[in-house]
């Protein structure tokens, strides 16, 4: 069919071609998702819209496309409008990240601080003024194609789409579905050498400039991996941004009716009826995308007035598209009734696997928008269930237990857990009560199965009592050092996974931590980490992915602090810090700063996020703790007061790294720009080569002189390092010394007795490597 169209066009006189400019991207909204998707995936070059290129330059933010010579084809229309082009010939792509952090990322992945790469093929998709610019700078005519660019276009689309579930990049697809104009621009660059590059300018992301490469191939799939991402040039991003997206539909209130029915095999089916109040802060639609767990299928949808609602849901896809009746304006809501079901819960013995703890209901693209929830669960009466929210009603009818849970304040994530649990309640006056839910029968079954396979798994006695004690004691400790938590009741349930999860008033813990408690403190830190999220991540949320260490790093440190202060585990505390330090040292060859959040992990290193955001983030707080420690009395009062102030100031809000820095500076009383630059935004870790000598001076006193050589960091790198001098007879002298620059000689205050030894970097006050050498 396409050949039948192309061949006659080859004979159209050139004088008839290009007289009327093609319409830009703005057009009427699509009546069908699948039809518009089909048009996008069928994009191909037009024989009647071909231009010869000679030194054409396109500039988009920090990127420049210099098309030296070749042929440019406009692509077939989508919704009656031109939204793409393909170029074949010789060109150069230039890209210069504006910040040191993003330049370092480019070095890590491409070996250079700025790109200047030749290319032979370029595919463009756009909703901006690109078409008008091309028509202004080029002359389009009917011509015979020198080569076939269709495979180039087809392969470029594979990086944006999945034909299995008919999904496409949601921001590009929203533009094509809604026929809207914006600054949206995408370029797929096939360079002379190496894998392709993908550049995108996205006005719906606060960090709207991205550069991606091809991720390592998994089978035959093609997927992009972002290596650089930063805000667009021009007016600076407003201070205090606490979201990563704009111009996106959200859901401000959920009313969910969940049915968990037992099947004949003892499994649990899942079905839900959801009333969603769709809202927006800026005009959107009529097509708007949401996310939903891939194994959930939509049965039907209608508006609150009973009219059918048009939705699209690809098979095993994560996107859920809803067509509103019209474009939604700020202040308006569109209540949607959605009915869906699917394979959400698996069973192994008496363990139940909830496959997605957060995407079991439709969510906005950002995934972090706040909403209130009213959730009713219907499930087998012999199962216990725990959920976010306050339990407002519970009744049994026949063999069905119905419970209702509501939230009084907007929250970011809602979840639940259920199983053949026994509950164990722990209470102490002045502390929110804790209900522990565990299936000890499931543990016994699992132990038998593993023994049959030759695997011996230790099983601790008093599982629920052991875990319950850490839950209550960590709550008690955090309430003392941080403040009152946001929830009035806490549930600690077990999940058959190796990780933990925290939601408002609900903590899900790995079955392993119920099965046994290790001797190094790992389990106590793990349990307390999840409890600490009630303060860090829930009580105080993080602003953007750059600030996620304020949740995960803070929670890791909190677990350590609990181990140290509440459980008397000083040796375990410092032992764990040292193990984390070794993990951090392992990342020194290809480092990333904490500030990169989830982007610290990549195809090159999938463990970096855990090590840098969690463990190094905890180290940052530990260093601040030691920096603020009263050395004479070993009291944490200043540090504790600072943490309480931060929690009190930002409770119920999102906080950024800059917000935390301001609180730190208020309590320390001076600028801490250098500290955050080094440890949050930087990647350097110092090595200290330390020598000391002791001299007797007049009056029977002794003088200690330190010589410190600082390596592997910039010349202006500085830290205040704790030094302890052993004076014998259980006496010590404690000092802080400022180490700055490649070489320092530091004279300590005179001492009343001859030193027996000197400990440099006592209390692990600095994340560093210390090597003691002779004078």
Where in this protein do the model-derived segments appear?
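Zinc-dependent metallopeptidase catalytic helix centered on the HExxH motif
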Residues: 353, 377, 472, 508-581, ...
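Amphipathic alpha-helical substructures
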Residues: 282, 610-706
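Acidic/His/Gly-enriched intrinsically disordered linker/tail segments
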Residues: 552, 556-623, 627, 650
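Solvent-exposed beta-strand/loop surfaces of large extracellular or lumenal domains
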Residues: 53, 63-66, 71-115, 119-123, ...
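Beta-strand-rich binding/interaction modules
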Residues: 286-288, 294-305, 386, 635, ...
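Glycine/proline-rich low-complexity spacer/linker segments in large multi-domain proteins
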Residues: 239-248, 330, 339-378, 427, ...
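Hydrophobic helix-coil surface modules that form long, contiguous segments used
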Residues: 234-275, 279-284, 291-295, 364-528, ...
């Amino acid at each position: 069919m396409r050949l039948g169209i192309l061949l006659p066009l080859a004979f159209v006189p050139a004088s008839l071609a290009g007289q009327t400019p093609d319409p830009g991207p703005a057009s009427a909204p699509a009546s069908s998702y699948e039809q518009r998707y089909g048009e996008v995936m069928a994009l191909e070059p037009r024989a009647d819209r071909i231009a010869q290129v000679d030194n054409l330059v396109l500039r988009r933010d920090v990127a420049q496309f210099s098309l030296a010579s070749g042929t440019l084809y406009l692509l077939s229309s989508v919704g009656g409008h031109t939204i793409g082009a393909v170029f074949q010939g010789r060109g150069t792509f230039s890209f210069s990240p504006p910040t040191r952090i993003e330049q370092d990322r480019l070095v890590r992945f491409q070996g250079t601080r700025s790109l200047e790469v030749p290319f032979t093929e370029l595919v463009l998709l756009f909703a901006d003024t690109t078409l008008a610019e091309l028509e202004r700078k080029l002359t389009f005519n009917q011509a015979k194609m020198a080569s076939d660019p269709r495979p180039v276009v087809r392969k470029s689309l594979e990086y944006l789409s999945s034909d299995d579930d008919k999904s496409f990049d949601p921001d590009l697809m929203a533009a094509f579905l809604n026929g809207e104009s914006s600054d949206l621009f995408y370029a797929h660059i096939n360079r002379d050498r190496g894998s392709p590059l993908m550049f995108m300018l996205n006005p719906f992301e606060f960090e709207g400039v991205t550069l991606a490469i091809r991720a390592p191939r998994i089978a035959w799939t093609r997927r992009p991996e972002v290596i650089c991402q930063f805000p667009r040039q021009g007016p600076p991003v407003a201070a205090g941004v606490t979201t990563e997206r704009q111009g996106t539909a959200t859901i401000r209130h959920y009313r969910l009716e969940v049915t968990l029915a037992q099947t004949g095999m003892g499994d649990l089916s899942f079905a839900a009826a959801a009333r969603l109040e769709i809202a927006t802060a800026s005009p959107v639609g009529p097509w708007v995308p949401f996310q939903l767990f891939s194994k959930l299928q939509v049965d039907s949808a209608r508006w609150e007035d009973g009219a059918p609602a048009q939705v699209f849901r690809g098979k095993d896809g994560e996107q859920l598209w809803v067509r509103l009746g019209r474009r939604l304006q700020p202040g308006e809501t569109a209540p949607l009734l959605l009915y869906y079901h699917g394979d959400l819960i698996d069973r192994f013995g008496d363990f139940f696997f909830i496959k997605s703890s957060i995407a079991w209901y439709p969510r906005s693209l950002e995934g972090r928008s706040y909403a209130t929830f009213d959730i009713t669960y219907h499930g087998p009466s012999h199962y216990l269930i725990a959920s976010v929210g306050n339990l407002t009603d519970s009744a049994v009818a026949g063999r069905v237990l119905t419970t209702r849970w509501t939230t009084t304040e907007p929250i970011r994530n809602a979840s639940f857990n259920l199983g053949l649990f026994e509950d164990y309640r722990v209470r102490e006056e002045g502390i929110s009560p804790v209900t522990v839910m565990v299936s000890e029968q499931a543990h016994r079954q699992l132990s038998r199965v593993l023994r049959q396979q030759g695997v011996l798994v230790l099983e601790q006695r008093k599982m629920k009592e052991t875990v319950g004690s850490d839950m209550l004691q960590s709550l008690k400790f955090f309430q003392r050092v941080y403040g009152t938590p946001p929830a009035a009741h806490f549930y600690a349930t077990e999940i058959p996974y190796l990780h933990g999860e925290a939601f408002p008033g609900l903590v899900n813990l790995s079955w392993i931590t119920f099965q046994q408690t290790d001797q190094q403190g790992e389990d106590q830190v793990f349990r307390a980490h999840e409890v600490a999220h009630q303060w860090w991540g829930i009580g105080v949320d993080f602003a953007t992915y750059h600030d996620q260490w304020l949740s995960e790093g803070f929670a890791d440190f909190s677990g350590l602090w609990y181990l140290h202060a509440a459980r008397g585990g000083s040796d375990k505390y410092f032992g764990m810090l040292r193990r984390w330090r070794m993990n951090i040292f392992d990342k020194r060859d290809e480092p990333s700063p904490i500030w990169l959040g989830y982007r610290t992990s990549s195809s090159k290193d999938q463990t970096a996020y855990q090590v840098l955001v969690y463990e190094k983030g905890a180290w940052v707080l530990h260093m601040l703790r030691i920096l603020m420690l009263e050395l004479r009395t070993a009291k944490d009062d200043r540090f504790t007061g600072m943490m309480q102030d931060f929690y009190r100031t930002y409770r119920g809000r999102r906080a950024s790294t800059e917000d935390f820095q301001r609180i730190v500076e208020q309590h320390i009383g001076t600028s801490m720009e250098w500290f955050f630059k080094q440890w949050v935004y930087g990647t350097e870790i110092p090595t200290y080569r330390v020598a000391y000598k002791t001299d007797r001076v007049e009056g029977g006193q002794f003088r200690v002189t330190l010589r410190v050589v600082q390596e592997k960091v910039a010349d202006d790198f500085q830290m205040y390092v704790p030094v302890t001098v052993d004076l014998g007879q259980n006496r010590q002298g404690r000092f802080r010394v400022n180490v700055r620059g490649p070489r320092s000689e530091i004279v300590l205050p005179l001492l009343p007795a001859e030193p027996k030894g000197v400990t440099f970097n006592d209390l692990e006050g600095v994340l560093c490597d210390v090597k003691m050498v002779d004078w």
